[in-house]
Amino acid sequence: YSTSAMKLTGDEFTFAPSVFDHGTARIHYRGNGVFAIVNNPKSFSNVANHWSKMNVEKLAARNIAFGKSEGIFAPDDYVTRAEFAVMITRALAITEEEGTVNFEDVSGWYEKDISTAYSAGIINGRDDGKFYPNERIKRKDMAVMICNALRFAGKEITVENEQEILAKFVDNSTIDEYARGSVAYCAKAGIIMGRDTKDFDPDGNATRAEATAIIERMLRYLDFIN
């Protein structure tokens, strides 16, 4: 699962959504460029025996997921708003979109990807004009970002039986109105699951390992990976 189509961008490879069938790669990419089939295995010492090993290594091989330091992924650390936005942006291969919006509290390694994600309609800032990149992302906001990403990729996001789907979560009344449609869609699509307690836990956080599982399911739902 470490082989994928990649696009040569400058002097580095970026993920090109692609599926393989009997040795043939079908690439879903918005635009032209130089593409190659690349085997790029990645491993992290602290996921060797972790349940997320395949998801983490699969996304890392495509330069979507990334460690916190060389060889260290920290799967049980909570994922931040910046980290999740960057993973979605790279997963959809939209790193070349022109990002022109700069949040006053966004700078550093994730600045370009976050600006790109905003321009693509995947993320929004808060009312005060900030993004709060280092905050732990809430599960309800992950659902909103995922649906925005699916919409960007061409999916029509509608849920006819929203109340019926949400009723399966015992805490469904605590899901904010702005996120209810997104939570229902992600649950129905099997992209974001509820907790073992039958809660959705909308204000709860997710680990970096859980984030890779969600991104991987999103990519399979879009038929962007095998």
Can you say where each PLM-predicted feature lies in the sequence?
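Proteolytic processing hotspots in large secreted/extracellular or virion-associated proteins
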Residues: Y1-S4, T9
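Surface-exposed charge patches
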Residues: M6, E57, S115, A184
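Feature responds to low-complexity, polar/acidic, surface-exposed segments characteristic
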Residues: G10-F20, H28-M54, A61, F66-D113, ...
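Aromatic sugar-binding surface patches on proteins
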Residues: G23
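Alpha-helical membrane segments in multi-pass integral membrane proteins
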Residues: D176-K188
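Short, hydrophobic-biased amphipathic alpha-helical segments
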Residues: T207-I214
